UniProtKB/Swiss-Prot annotation:
Belongs to the bacterial ribosomal protein bL33 family. One of its GO terms (cellular component) is ribosome. The gene is rpmG. InterPro entries: Ribosomal_bL33, Ribosomal_bL33_sf, Ribosomal_zn-bd. This is Large ribosomal subunit protein bL33. One of its GO terms (biological process) is translation. Gene3D superfamilies: Ribosomal protein L33. The keyword Lyase does not apply. PANTHER family: 50S RIBOSOMAL PROTEIN L33, CHLOROPLASTIC, LARGE RIBOSOMAL SUBUNIT PROTEIN BL33C. It holds the Pfam family Ribosomal_L33. The keyword Zinc does not apply. NCBIfam families: PRK00504.1, PRK00595.1, rpmG_bact.
Length: 60
């Protein structure tokens, strides 16, 4: 039998650079395995309001 999907959770990534500059914040949703990745995710994603790739950190 297949195991349940209770280890994978939906998280939100929010742009940090736009937040500092007071511009429109871009957000992405993705999933992560909370057993393998216990700390907060930090990914480089595209921010359409700034028109460049910026750091996006996991928020609650």
């Amino acid at each position: 039998m297949a195991k349940g999907k209770e280890n994978r959770i939906v998280i939100t990534l929010e742009c940090t650079e736009a937040k500092k500059e007071g511009k429109t914040v871009s957000r992405y949703t993705t999933t992560k395995n909370k057993k393998n990745t216990t700390d907060r995710l930090v990914l480089k994603k595209y921010n359409p309001s700034m028109q460049k790739h910026t750091l996006h950190k996991e928020i609650k």
